[in-house]
């Protein structure tokens, strides 16, 4: 079986840090919404027990690629009869270190797709636990619904924010999350808010001042967007986004972007494009993932 699957981007529409665990992980309150734009993964199931990424990324060792790690983790937890393997092709559109969740989304799509193609029968909670062992951002992609993520990202409350249009700018810099999260001046003690309070306050990313001060090129992109629309950082960066009510408004401003700005336009969606594909093919995500 050969199937192609989307691995969508995400935006953090707001992001706050409410504490820090003894193990160093930060406790968050963040609103995650998907974009109708992202990577694409093609998977061919095999019966030779090998997991192969046939177009490996030169910037990441294959053994460290989250797609390979996710596939091997599922392989170890799949009770399917006989040998199972996969040949995988990854089409990358989301830059590494951009705050758009590309690696986490790739891993989540790999887990969901291979769970189906290998007929492992794991439910959504099992897949989420596997994903969490690889990265805190992965569970929200597995559940596939816009959500308030709390804890280190594993506690999800589905919400329905407005589905706006976004002009996403991609500064030419890769930012490691730990670089920003370990910054001594990063605020880490914001009082936890109720969901109602979170939606009544102006959206804000607590990492934005640290990231823009550390990386002037990110500030340059953000200041340009702010001339035209409400704009913020996603994750710890480097990606920044401006929000619009209509596609035409977003395209009009994109037509004005300077030559040094790389960008794309996408719509915010509250159901992951991966789960929309499952529904369109009449395979409901709940039926696919829940036993």
Swiss-Prot record:
Q: Which UniProt keywords are present, listed alphabetically?
A: ATP-binding, Isoprene biosynthesis, Kinase, Nucleotide-binding, Transferase
What residues form the catalytic site here?
Answer: 10, 137
What are the BP-aspect GO terms? isopentenyl diphosphate biosynthetic process, methylerythritol 4-phosphate pathway; terpenoid biosynthetic process
Q: Name one Pfam family in it.
A: GHMP_kinases_N
Q: Does the keyword Transcription regulation apply?
A: no
The residues the record assigns to binding ATP are 95-105
Q: EC number(s) on record?
A: 2.7.1.148
GO MF annotations for this entry?
4-(cytidine 5'-diphospho)-2-C-methyl-D-erythritol kinase activity; ATP binding
The pathway to which it is assigned is: Isoprenoid biosynthesis; isopentenyl diphosphate biosynthesis via DXP pathway; isopentenyl diphosphate from 1-deoxy-D-xylulose 5-phosphate: step 3/6
InterPro entries linked to this entry: GHMP_kinase_C_sf (IPR036554), GHMP_kinase_N_dom (IPR006204), IspE (IPR004424), Ribosomal_Su5_D2-typ_SF (IPR020568), Ribsml_uS5_D2-typ_fold_subgr (IPR014721)
Catalytic activity entry = 4-CDP-2-C-methyl-D-erythritol + ATP = 4-CDP-2-C-methyl-D-erythritol 2-phosphate + ADP + H(+)
Task: Write out the function statement from the record.
Answer: Catalyzes the phosphorylation of the position 2 hydroxy group of 4-diphosphocytidyl-2C-methyl-D-erythritol.
Q: Spell out the family assignment given in the record's similarity comment.
A: Belongs to the GHMP kinase family. IspE subfamily.
PANTHER family linked to this entry: 4-DIPHOSPHOCYTIDYL-2-C-METHYL-D-ERYTHRITOL KINASE, CHLOROPLASTIC
Q: What is this protein called?
A: 4-diphosphocytidyl-2-C-methyl-D-erythritol kinase
- State the organism named in the record: Baumannia cicadellinicola subsp. Homalodisca coagulata
């Amino acid at each position: 079986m050969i199937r192609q699957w989307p691995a969508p981007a995400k935006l953090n529409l707001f992001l706050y840090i409410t504490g820090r665990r003894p193990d160093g992980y930060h406790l968050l309150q963040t609103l995650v919404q998907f974009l109708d734009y992202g990577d694409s993964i093609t998977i061919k199931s095999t019966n030779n027990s090998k997991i192969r990424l046939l177009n490996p990324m030169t910037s990441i060792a294959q053994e460290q690629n989250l797609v390979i790690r996710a596939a091997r983790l599922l392989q170890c937890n799949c009770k399917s009869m006989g040998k199972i393997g996969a040949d995988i092709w990854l089409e990358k559109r989301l830059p590494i270190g951009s705050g758009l969740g590309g690696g986490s989304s790739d891993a989540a799509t790999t887990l969901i797709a291979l769970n189906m193609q290998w007929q492992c029968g794991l439910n959504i909670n099992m897949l989420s636990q596997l994903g969490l062992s690889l990265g805190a951002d992965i569970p929200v992609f597995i559940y596939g619904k816009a959500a308030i993520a709390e804890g280190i990202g594993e506690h999800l409350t589905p919400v329905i924010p407005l589905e706006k249009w976004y002009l996403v700018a991609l500064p030419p810099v890769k930012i490691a999350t730990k670089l920003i999260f370990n910054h001594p001046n990063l605020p880490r003690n914001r009082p936890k808010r109720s969901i109602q309070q979170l939606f009544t306050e102006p959206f804000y990313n607590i990492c934005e001042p640290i990231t823009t001060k550390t990386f002037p090129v990110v500030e340059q992109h953000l200041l340009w967007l702010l001339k035209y629309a409400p704009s913020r950082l996603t994750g710890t960066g480097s990606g920044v986004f401006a929000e619009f009510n209509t596609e035409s408004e977003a395209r009009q401003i994109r037509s004005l972007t300077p030559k040094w700005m790389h960008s794309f336009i996408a719509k915010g969606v509250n159901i992951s494009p991966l789960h929309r594909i499952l529904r369109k093919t009449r395979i409901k995500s709940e039926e696919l993932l829940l036993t």
